[in-house]
Design a protein with these regions (language model features):
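NAD(P)-dependent Rossmann-like dehydrogenase/reductase catalytic/cofactor-binding core
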Residues: 133, 143, 147-150, 178, ...
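A general alpha-helix detector
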Residues: 21, 120-121, 168-172, 203, ...
């Protein structure tokens, strides 16, 4: 397997991250040291795009910036054979990224969910021009490496996982902004109930286990009260503008330096 990066520094960081994750698997008894060494030996790195022309399958993993992804696909188009499969790891529709390639029928989205080394599911979505056999190949390939493909029927923004996740995030931020509950109460409520429930049954399965008649009755009552905003919440916008982004910046809703959980 070849990893092609923009520069040596980014490749060094990528290699280091892979080694750390593989070492964690060894430490937990999920693989042996010999298997880990064999895996790492199979990975080569470089900055020469032409190396992609030697592969049967190329997948982009650049930041989710559409212009950059389109540029990468355009460069690959000048290098790769017409029968190669090209894929995007983005949760954005593949149809929005193929305007600079001459074989859009060979392009497919394969969205690995972060952290990819732990999450077994990969969303697979072809565009309007993608050949059915390319989508089938992508699913078969993922199955062969121990992943579970989630095949989508339509090329839509966000795919399955992000659409579900952002529905939850929108309501969570709305409840905090409206003073319904603290961030800690909201997070604990999810972790200690839905987080555990949905690890065994999905939302549609859970609804059928509880009864669709009950779901329908409660939906009539609750749906009108749930947030349906079309823009990010103001509280989130203010945090981003202030530079209080996340764990890396040390502060968001939570003060990560002390992690007191009071919000």
């Amino acid at each position: 397997m070849s990893i092609i990066g923009r520069n040596d520094d980014s490749l060094a960081r990528a290699r280091s991250a892979i080694e750390v994750n593989v070492a964690a698997f060894v430490d937990r008894g999920l693989t042996s040291e010999d298997e880990a060494a064999t895996l790492l030996d199979r990975i080569t790195t470089g900055t020469d795009y032409n190396a992609a022309g030697k592969e049967d399958f190329v997948i982009e993993a650049v930041p989710a910036q559409r212009d950059l992804q389109i540029e990468v696909f355009g460069r690959l188009d000048t290098i790769c054979d017409a029968d190669i499969v090209v894929a995007s790891t983005s949760g954005q529709p593949i149809s929005l990224m193929v305007n600079r390639i001459s074989y859009p029928e060979r392009a497919v989205a394969m969205h690995f969910v972060y952290p990819a080394q732990l999450m077994p599911l990969v969303e697979v979505c072809g565009g309007p021009q993608t050949l059915p056999e390319v989508v089938t190949w992508a699913c078969d390939f993922l199955t062969s490496i121990g992943r579970t493909p989630a095949l989508m029927n339509k090329d839509v923004d966000g795919f399955i996982v992000n659409r579900l996740q952002f529905a939850v995030l929108r309501e969570a931020w709305s409840m905090r902004a409206n003073g319904i509950a603290s961030a800690e109460a909201i997070d604990n409520s999810f972790k200690m109930t839905l987080g555990r429930l949905y690890s065994d049954t999905g939302p549609i399965e859970s609804a059928e286990l509880g009864g669709l008649d009950i779901l329908h009755t409660f939906a009539e009552f609750l749906f009108p009260a749930i947030d349906d905003s079309k823009t990010p919440p103001e509280a989130l916008t203010e945090l981003v503008r202030a530079g209080n982004h996340d764990l890396k910046s040390g502060k968001g809703i939570y003060g990560w330096a002390e992690r007191d959980g009071q919000a």
